[in-house]
Amino acid sequence: MIVLTRRISDPGTLAVSGTVTLDVDSRIKSRLRLTLDDGREAGLMLERGHLLRGGELLADADGTHLIRVLAAPEAVSTVRCADPHLLARAAYHLGNRHVPLQIEPGLLRFQHDHVLDDMLRGLGLTVEAEQAPFEPEAGAYQSAPHGHSHAHGHDHPFVRLPAHS
């Protein structure tokens, strides 16, 4: 069995030797037994706290196997809207419910849920149930790569904003 232990950002001269197609629930896991798309057995033994993204490369300890992760199409609800204010309202209401959310210009996507679909329709949005890869924002599962940390040597002063009239 191939044991994938490393994320590879620059494969150099290594050639991709296989792919694995995973839904978002599997891409959240750091320990997982899986079957590559060509039928070979493999295991994930990765650091915790990182959502695998479609296109990421994984390797075994000695670099013999380089595997590309593919995001599997899955049941999602997709909202497309040209009105940024309406889209922001939808994102607010979904975020208030802690829904993992994929955000792109003019588009919101989340794992299909008919109750959430109805809520968004009530806001005046059109919601499509479809099969598509789901790539939620990093904040739902992990801190974003190269994100801002507050573990540094200075304070952020509190600023009181004036009350709205």
From Swiss-Prot:
Keywords, comma-separated and alphabetical: Chaperone, Cytoplasm, Nickel, Nickel insertion
Compartment(s) of residence: Cytoplasm
Principal subcellular localization: cytoplasm
UniProt GO molecular function: nickel cation binding; unfolded protein binding
Region spans: Disordered: 137-156
Function (record text): Involved in urease metallocenter assembly. Binds nickel. Probably functions as a nickel donor during metallocenter assembly.
Name of the protein in question: Urease accessory protein UreE
Provenance organism: Pseudomonas putida (strain GB-1)
Lineage of the species this protein comes from: Bacteria, Pseudomonadati, Pseudomonadota, Gammaproteobacteria, Pseudomonadales
Gene behind the chain: ureE
